[in-house]
Every structure is written in C-alpha cells, then in structure tokens.
Amino acid sequence: GYRRMLSEARILLRIKDAGLPVPAVWDVDLENGRIVMERMNGRPLIDILRDDSVPDESKHLALENSGAAVRMLHRMAVTHGDLSTNNILIDESYDAYLIDFGLSAVEYEVERFGIDLHVMDEILGASHPNITDGIEIFLSGYLNCDQLMGALTELSGGMPPLAGEVMKRLEDVRSRVRYHG
C-alpha cells in the first residue's frame, strides 16, 4: 500500500542524493499508487549471466560491479530486501544499477545486510550454476568497495556495519541455513 510506496520513494531519494546509481524519482502519485521514475538503461544481470555471447571476463566484471553497488547501498544503511539477478541492471560498460526497492529498509543491525548477501549467494548457486565462483566474484566487489571509498561515515541513525562484519554475518546465516536445511 501507501506505506510501502512512500518508503520506497524515500529510500530512492536518500540513496540517489548520496550519488548511488539508482533511478531518479520524478513523482509519487499516492492516489493512483504509482511512483514515476527514471528509466534505467541496461540488461538484468540474469540475462548477462545466461548470455553465451557475453565473455566470461565481462560476466565477472558485471558480478564484481554488482557487489560494489550493493556495498555502496549498505554503506548508506539501506538493505535491499529483494536482491536478485533480476534487480540489478548492467549497462554496456558492465556497470551495475540497483532497481526495485519495494522491500528495502533503512537498517543498522548487521543481520539484514547478511541476509541480502545470502539471498544473492543462493540465487547465484541455484540460477547460475554455470558461473564458477559467482558469489566469490560478487563478494570481491563488495569488499573492494570499502577499500576504494575509504572509511564509513556516521549517519543520522548511527554507523552502518563494516563490510567485514557483514561478511561474518553472511557466514553465520549460511551455517544456520545449512543446520536447519
């Protein structure tokens, strides 16, 4: 409903203002339940990974850039909530753009960040088994982002978790899922 739509618009504005590669919001029409936003050019990551004409090197670059885009989001204390290879667009330079923030949230607890990464891990393993080390390549982009961008900035709600803390939580989530699976 309205709350979810308003939340999505607010989060998009927050992260766009911070310079993250996401669609610009042009209008929020509560009456008709619509958000009008910029159309992003690119192909879904799922299509890039399944396209036999795309060289492995380019697929790896798309995965690495996708990991960096997710870390940039997490550095803003925002979890995606529906991270998948359908919700990442890849442009002709293999840069990554995140889309579909309907389930995203401003968050400071490390658990949901780890869950974002775990969902991507599961999707890469299940939907893209032909991509060797897909999650490792994605996570290398995630980790390298902090090295490129430097120290985290404290936000109004506190400090977002460090990449290393999120990686540790990913391992915790993986072990819980394996144990209960």
PLM feature spans:
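ATP-binding glycine-rich loop module of kinase domains
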Residues: 1-5
